[in-house]
C-alpha cells in the first residue's frame, strides 16, 4: 500500500509541472483601454496578470509625466488610484508587469470631462407684459466646452441654439451661457422656459450627456388705472367722517397703500387696506391723500384732496321748548351740545330769578334738576353754552300744573229709595284752577257741570268740588255715578288731562210689610213648642232681629234668625215678642203676644184682718192665683141649702159689719181653659158679750165641723189635681204627702 502512494504522488507532481509550463504569461487592465473620468471624481485603474506567481508591476505615463496617483500592489494585481481626478490625469497610462525574464505592458487612455450640474436660467428682471426681457441660460464648470451645445425653448418653441466650437487648447473649467431677449405677453403665463445643455461625448454611454433646467413663466402687469372713490364727499364738516376706497389693476393684484402728503412733501403712511375711513375729522385732517397700487414690478398712484370745513356747534335742550311739570314731581332739563368737544355751561332764568334746582355738567351734557317742582320753578330757563370764542343759548319754558289724584265721590248718606241725597265730587290739590271743569253723570245722563273760570293770580293748590242733590229711585240701582274732572291745557303735553271716579249706585229700600207667622198659635199650653217666623221686605234684604219686651219696657235681644223657636215653654215665656227688619235704609217692627196657659196654681184664700172676727167688724175675703193670666176667680159661701156665689172684685169680697150669719165656709175656685183649683177657709164671727146667742151650742158645733171639713175637702182637691197632672191618683200617696 505505501508503495502505491509513492507512485501516485510522483505522477501528480509531474503532471502539475507540465500544466504550469503550459500556462502563458498574460496581462489585463480594467478598464480595458479607455476611461472617461469626471474632474473631481475618484478613479482606480487596475492591472492584473496570469501565468506568473509573483509578478512585478510599474506604472508610467506615455510621455513620462507624473502619475498624479497612488499605486497599490497586491499579489497578481496592481491598482493606480487618482483622487481627485484633475487635468494632470489626462494621459495614456502604461502598466508594465515583469515575471522573471518576461515583461508585458498594457496601456489605458484616461480622458477627462466636467458636466457636474444642470443649467441655470436667469432673468434680467421680472416678466412684465409688453416689456423686453433677457433670459440667460448658464452651464457651469464644463469641459471640454468645444463639445457643448445649449438650446433655449419657450414651451415647444426653440428660441435659440448654440454650439461652442472655438478652438480651446487651454485646459480649464469654464461657464458657458446663452442669452435670448424676448417680449413676454399675457399668453405666456403658465408656459415654461427650458434650457437644455448637451455634451457630445458619443463613445461613453455611461456619462450623462444632457442636462436641462425648467422655469415656469409668471408674467406680471404693472399697476395701472388706479382709481379713488370718496364717500360722502371730498368736502366735509368738522366732526364728520369719510370713507375713501382705492382700486388698481395689475398682475399680481396690486397691494394698496394709503398715505398723506405732508407739508414738506414727504408721505405719512396711514393704512395698507383698500379702504381708508376717517372719523371725527378735524381741520388738521385737510390735505392731499395718496393711494398707491404696488406689486412686484411697479407702482401706480392716485391723489385726492380732502377739505375739512369748520362745523358750527349746535345746542339742543330737552324735553323740548316747553314742558308741563306736575307740582311735587321731579323734572330734569338737559342741555346737549353737538359739534364741540369741551363746552362750558351756565343756567339762568329769563328774569334772573333763583334757579331753585341742582346743576350737573359732564362732557357735552348739562342737566338742571328741579326736585320737587314748586311754584318757584314756573319760569323760562336758559342754557348758555360756550365753545371756544362762540356762545349759543337755548331756552325752555317750565309750566306748572297739579292734577295728582282722581276725584273723590262722597254722599251725605246712604241711597234710600225716595229720599233725597247730596252728592259731592271733590278734586284735590288742583292747579291752575281756571282751567278746571267738573262734570257729574248718572249713567250717560249729565246731572251737573261746572267750570271754574274765575280769574286768579294766586298760586296755590286748592280743592274744588261740585255738589248736587237728587232723589234716587229703585231704577237707579246698578247705574254708574261718574265724577269727571278735566284740566283744559291743550297746548301742554302731560298725562292725564282727564281723571274720573266711578261709583255704582245701590238704592236701598227701607224694610216694610214686616209680618210674623206663629205656629201653631200664639196661645199655648205650658210645655208646648212654638215657631215664630218673621218676614220683612226691603233692599238690601233686611236683617231680622228678635227681642222680647221686658216689664220695664227694655228689649232683650234673642236671635238674629228669621225663625225664633221656643221649646217646652213655660208660663214665664209669656209676653210681647218683637221682630225687627233692619237694613241701611231703616227698620220695621212687628209685635206678637205669646200667652202660655197653665192650670191655676198657688191659689191663696185669705181673710183680712183675720179668719176670726167679731160681730160688726169688716172682713175682706181675698182669693189670688199666682201669675196665671185670664183666670176666672169664683168666690162662694158654702151652705147646706146650696152655695152662694159672691160678687167679688178682682177676687176680693168685702163683708161690712159682719154678722153671725156671715160665719161659715168660704170657697175660692180658680179656673181657666186648662183646669181649675179650689181653696177654702172658715170664717168665725164671734158675737158681742151682750149677745146671748153668740155662743150657742149649735153654732159652736158647726164652727168646729166646718173647720175640719173644709181643710179636708181642700186637701182632697189638691191631691186629685196633682194626680191628674201625673196621670193617676193614689190615696196612699196622698196620705204620704200629707204626712
UniProtKB/Swiss-Prot annotation:
InterPro entries: ICAM_VCAM, ICAM_VCAM_N, Ig-like_dom, Ig-like_dom_sf, Ig-like_fold, Ig_C2-set, Ig_I-set, Ig_sub. Keywords: Cell adhesion, Cell membrane, Disulfide bond, Glycoprotein, Immunoglobulin domain, Membrane, Repeat, Secreted, Signal, Transmembrane, Transmembrane helix, Ubl conjugation. It holds the Pfam family ig. Changing residue 730 to A: Loss of RAC1 activation and subsequent leukocyte transmigration. Disulfide bonds join 47-95, 52-99, 137-195, 246-291, 335-383, 534-579. Glycans are attached at residues 273, 365, 417, 463, 531, 561. The keyword Glycoprotein applies. The keyword Transcription regulation does not apply. One of its GO terms (biological process) is cell adhesion. Expressed on inflamed vascular endothelium, as well as on macrophage-like and dendritic cell types in both normal and inflamed tissue. Induction: By pro-inflammatory cytokines, including TNFalpha, and also by ROS, oxidized low density lipoprotein, high glucose concentration, toll-like receptor agonists, and shear stress. Residues 721-739 are cytoplasmic. Cleaved by the metalloproteinase ADAM17 to generate the soluble form. Residues 25-698 are extracellular. One of its GO terms (molecular function) is cell adhesion molecule binding. Residues 1-24 form the signal peptide. Either the first or the fourth Ig-like C2-type domain is required for VLA4-dependent cell adhesion. Cell adhesion glycoprotein predominantly expressed on the surface of endothelial cells that plays an important role in immune surveillance and inflammation. Acts as a major regulator of leukocyte adhesion to the endothelium through interaction with different types of integrins. During inflammatory responses, binds ligands on the surface of activated endothelial cells to initiate the activation of calcium channels and the plasma membrane-associated small GTPase RAC1 leading to leukocyte transendothelial migration. This is Vascular cell adhesion protein 1. It comes from Homo sapiens (Human).
Amino acid at each position: 500500500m505505501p508503495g502505491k502512494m509513492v507512485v501516485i504522488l510522483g505522477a501528480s507532481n509531474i503532471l502539475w509541472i507540465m500544466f504550469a509550463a503550459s500556462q502563458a504569461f498574460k496581462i489585463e487592465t480594467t478598464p480595458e483601454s479607455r476611461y472617461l473620468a469626471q474632474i473631481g471624481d475618484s478613479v482606480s485603474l487596475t492591472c492584473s496578470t496570469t501565468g506568473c506567481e509573483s509578478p512585478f508591476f510599474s506604472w508610467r505615463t506615455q510621455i513620462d509625466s507624473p502619475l498624479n496617483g497612488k499605486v497599490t500592489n497586491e499579489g497578481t494585481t496592481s491598482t493606480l488610484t487618482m483622487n481627485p481626478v484633475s487635468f494632470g490625469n489626462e494621459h495614456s497610462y502604461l502598466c508594465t508587469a515583469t515575471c522573471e525574464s518576461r515583461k508585458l505592458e498594457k496601456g489605458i487612455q484616461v480622458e477627462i470631462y466636467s458636466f457636474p450640474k444642470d443649467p441655470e436660467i436667469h432673468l434680467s428682471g421680472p416678466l412684465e407684459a409688453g416689456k423686453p426681457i433677457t433670459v440667460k441660460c448658464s452651464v457651469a464648470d464644463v469641459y471640454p466646452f468645444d463639445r457643448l451645445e445649449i438650446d433655449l425653448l419657450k414651451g415647444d418653441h426653440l428660441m435659440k441654439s448654440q454650439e461652442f466650437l472655438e478652438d480651446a487648447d487651454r485646459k480649464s473649467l469654464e461657464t458657458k451661457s446663452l442669452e435670448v431677449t424676448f417680449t413676454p405677453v399675457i399668453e405666456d403665463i403658465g408656459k415654461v422656459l427650458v434650457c437644455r445643455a448637451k455634451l457630445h461625448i458619443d463613445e461613453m454611454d455611461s456619462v450623462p450627456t444632457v442636462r436641462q433646467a425648467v422655469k415656469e413663466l409668471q408674467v406680471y402687469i404693472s399697476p395701472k388705472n388706479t382709481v379713488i372713490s370718496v364717500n360722502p364727499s371730498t368736502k366735509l364738516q368738522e366732526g364728520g367722517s369719510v370713507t375713501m376706497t382705492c382700486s388698481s389693476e395689475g398682475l399680481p393684484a396690486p397691494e394698496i397703500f394709503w398715505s398723506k402728503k405732508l407739508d414738506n412733501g414727504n408721505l405719512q403712511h396711514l393704512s395698507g387696506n383698500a379702504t381708508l375711513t376717517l372719523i371725527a375729522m378735524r381741520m388738521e385732517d385737510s390735505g392731499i391723500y395718496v393711494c398707491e397700487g404696488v406689486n412686484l414690478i411697479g407702482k401706480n398712484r392716485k391723489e385726492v384732496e380732502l377739505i375739512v370745513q369748520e362745523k358750527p356747534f349746535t345746542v339742543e335742550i330737552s324735553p323740548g321748548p316747553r314742558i308741563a311739570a306736575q307740582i311735587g314731581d321731579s323734572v330734569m332739563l338737559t342741555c346737549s351740545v353737538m359739534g364741540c368737544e369741551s363746552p362750558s355751561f351756565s343756567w339762568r332764568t329769563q328774569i334772573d330769578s333763583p334757579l331753585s334746582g341742582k346743576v350737573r355738567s359732564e362732557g357735552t351734557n348739562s342737566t338742571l334738576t328741579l326736585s320737587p317742582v314748586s311754584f318757584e320753578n314756573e319760569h323760562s330757563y336758559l342754557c348758555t353754552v360756550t365753545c371756544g370764542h362762540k356762545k349759543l343759548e337755548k331756552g325752555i319754558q317750565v309750566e306748572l300744573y297739579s292734577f295728582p289724584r282722581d276725584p273723590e265721590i262722597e254722599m251725605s248718606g246712604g241711597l234710600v229709595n225716595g229720599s233725597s241725597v247730596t252728592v259731592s265730587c271733590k278734586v284735590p290739590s288742583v292747579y291752575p284752577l281756571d282751567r278746571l271743569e267738573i262734570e257729574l253723570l248718572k249713567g250717560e245722563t249729565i246731572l251737573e257741570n261746572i267750570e271754574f273760570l274765575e280769574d286768579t293770580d294766586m298760586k296755590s293748590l286748592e280743592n274744588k268740588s261740585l255738589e248736587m242733590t237728587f232723589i234716587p229711585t229703585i231704577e237707579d240701582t246698578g247705574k254708574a255715578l261718574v265724577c269727571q274732572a278735566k284740566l283744559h291745557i291743550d297746548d301742554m303735553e302731560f298725562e292725564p288731562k282727564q281723571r274720573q271716579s266711578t261709583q255704582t249706585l245701590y238704592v236701598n229700600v227701607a224694610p216694610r210689610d214686616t209680618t210674623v207667622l206663629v205656629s201653631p198659635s200664639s196661645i199655648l199650653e205650658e210645655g208646648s213648642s212654638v215657631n215664630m217666623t218673621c218676614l220683612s221686605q226691603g233692599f238690601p234684604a233686611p236683617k231680622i232681629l228678635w227681642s222680647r219686651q221686658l216689664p220695664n219696657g227694655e228689649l232683650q235681644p234673642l236671635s238674629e234668625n228669621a225663625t225664633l223657636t221656643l221649646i217646652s215653654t213655660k208660663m214665664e215665656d209669656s209676653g210681647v215678642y218683637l221682630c225687627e227688619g233692619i237694613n241701611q235704609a231703616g227698620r220695621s217692627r212687628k209685635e206678637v203676644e205669646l200667652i202660655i196657659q197653665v192650670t191655676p196654681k198657688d191659689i191663696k184664700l185669705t181673710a183680712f184682718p183675720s179668719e176670726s172676727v167679731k160681730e160688726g167688724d169688716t172682713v175682706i175675703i181675698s182669693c189670688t192665683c199666682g201669675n196665671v193670666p185670664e183666670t176666672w176667680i169664683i168666690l162662694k159661701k158654702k151652705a147646706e141649702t146650696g152655695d152662694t156665689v159672691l160678687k167679688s172684685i178682682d177676687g176680693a169680697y168685702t163683708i161690712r159689719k159682719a154678722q153671725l150669719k156671715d160665719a161659715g165656709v168660704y170657697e175660692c175656685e180658680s179656673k181657666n181653659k186648662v183646669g181649675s183649683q179650689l181653696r177654702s177657709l172658715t170664717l168665725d164671727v164671734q158675737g158681742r158679750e151682750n149677745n146671748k146667742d153668740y155662743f150657742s151650742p149649735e153654732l159652736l158645733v158647726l164652727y168646729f165641723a166646718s173647720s175640719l171639713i173644709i181643710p179636708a175637702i181642700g186637701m182632697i182637691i189638691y191631691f186629685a189635681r196633682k194626680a191628674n197632672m201625673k196621670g193617676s191618683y193614689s190615696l196612699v200617696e196622698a196620705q204620704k204627702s200629707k204626712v
